[in-house]
Amino acid sequence: LHSQLIVGNQVSWTGSKETLLQKFNKLLEGTTTNQLFLKPIMGIGGQGCMIISKSNLMESVIRHQKALLEQSYLIEEYIQQHPTINEIHPFAINTLRMVHYIDSNNTVHILSVLMRFGIGTSITDNTSTGGFSIAVNSKTGVLEGPGRQDLAKGGAVYSKHPDTQVALEGFVIPYFQEACNLVKKSAKYFPNRIVGWDIAITASGPVIIEANHNPSLHLSDVAYGGYKKHPLIKEILKEINI
């Protein structure tokens, strides 16, 4: 964090390559994957993210030293995703975007679900970094229809992942019901009535990556097939007199 590393309530200085190496070595000792995932605190859309690995720590620090000393990052332990999802795209953590809605009776609903996949060797699945999204049946957790890339990134449509050639439609998301339950439980801790949750699926179940107050509803709109016909969207519009 601008030449400072904040872990819990401890603050230390990281003003040189040597101290960066020392601090990252210490952080990596506490991981199970020997990898750290760094995302810019003020970043959006997966831009500027990086992976720091124990196996190439010196190379990573030298390559990213300027950014690490001048910018602010959130440092997280790298997640190992579920093996079946890894078969589709192994370089990025491919996440569910689950949008919750809390109605006027304080009941939490899953408004819609989509899944995002990275392409090539990208370490992020965001559509703004070239990935694509595909609809997920919110009751069964099954991928439906084609995957779609952002128009700004080419607008490609995929029935199979372009790198691994794994068929998309019909793929069943592991631990999907557990992911729904996790979102519904977590939603009660937020004042926002609509939040987009990024959920990763590991071999032992779902984990929360982040919650988004501005969850790019245009992607969910396309994945659902048009939010205008969604009964809960109609309820929302009626509540705000539209």
Predicted regions: what is each one?
Residues 197-199:
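Hydrophobic residue at the +6 position relative to the catalytic HRD Asp in the kinase catalytic loop
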Residues 1-105:
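Active-site nucleotide/adenylate-binding loops and adjacent lid/helix of ATP-dependent enzymes
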Residues 156-178, 185-192, 201-242:
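C-terminal active-site "lid" helix and adjoining low-complexity regulatory extension at the edge
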Residues 39, 76, 114, 210-214:
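Active-site ExK catalytic segment of metal-dependent nucleases
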Residues 45-46, 119-121, 207, 216-218:
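Flexible loop/turn segments at secondary-structure boundaries
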Residues 65, 80-81, 87-89, 93-178:
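ATP-dependent carboxylate/phosphate-activation module, predominantly the ATP-grasp catalytic core
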Residues 91-93, 103-109, 192-194, 203-206, ...:
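Coil-to-beta-strand transition motifs
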Residues 36, 109-111, 207-209:
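Protein kinase-like catalytic core scaffold
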